[in-house]
C-alpha cells in the first residue's frame, strides 16, 4: 500500500477493550484541545477536526460532549505532551506521541515496550526529521489527474496524489487540511473519506520482513496498550 496506508490506524476498534481505550484517548485529547483553544468548534479548528475524526471512528456523542463539558468547567487534570522516538524491529523508524499526567510512568511503559520487542529508544529528534507533518486524505477513486486539477483550481498546495488499489491518497502540508477538504467536498459532494487526518508521513519506507514482522506487530500492540499513548507513527513497509 501507499505511504498513507502505512500510517493509518484502524478506523474501528474490534474488541471491547480496544473500544474503551479508543474512547479514552479521544476523550483525553478533546479535553486538552478544548481547554487550550476554546470549547467552540467553529472557533477552534483543531477541536473541529478532532471531533470530526472521533465521529468517523464511531466515538459516541456522550464521550465527546463529556470531554468538552469538562473543559468548560476549568480546573480538572493537567496533561503534558510527551514524544518518544527510536527504531523498531527491522530498523524501522518510530514516533510515539503521548498525553500524560505522569511523565515518569509513561516513559517507563514506553521504554518497556521498546526493550521487550527488539527496539531501541532514541533521544528527541532521532527520527523526527525523517517524517513530515501532513494532511492526509484517502477515498475511493481512480483518476488522480482529475483530483490534482480540482486541487490546483482551488489554489491548494499539494505534496502528492497517488492511486493504489482503487483508492486515491492526497498528501498536503498540514496547514492545508481544511483547504483540501473544502476543495474536494465542493467538487464531489458525495465523497466519502476513508482517512482524513493530520499525521506524520515518512519520507522513506523501511522494509520489514521475515521474523521481524511478528515482532513488529507485537511491538506496536504493546505501545498501543499503554494508556497514555495517543498515536504511533512508523515507516515500516511490511513484506508479505
From Swiss-Prot:
BP GO terms, sorted: regulation of DNA-templated transcription
Compartment(s) where it occurs, according to its Swiss-Prot or TrEMBL record: Cytoplasm
Record keywords, A-Z: Cytoplasm, DNA-binding, Transcription, Transcription regulation
UniProt-recorded Gene Ontology molecular function terms: DNA binding
UniProt entry tagged with the keyword Disulfide bond: no
TM regions (residue ranges): none
One GO cellular component term: cytosol
Listed InterPro entries: Integrase-like_N, TACO1_YebC-like_2nd/3rd_dom, TACO1_YebC_N, Transcrip_reg_TACO1-like, Transcrip_reg_TACO1-like_dom3, YebC-like
Family to which this protein belongs: Belongs to the TACO1 family.
Cited NCBIfam families: PRK12378.1
Protein name from the UniProt record: Probable transcriptional regulatory protein SO_3401
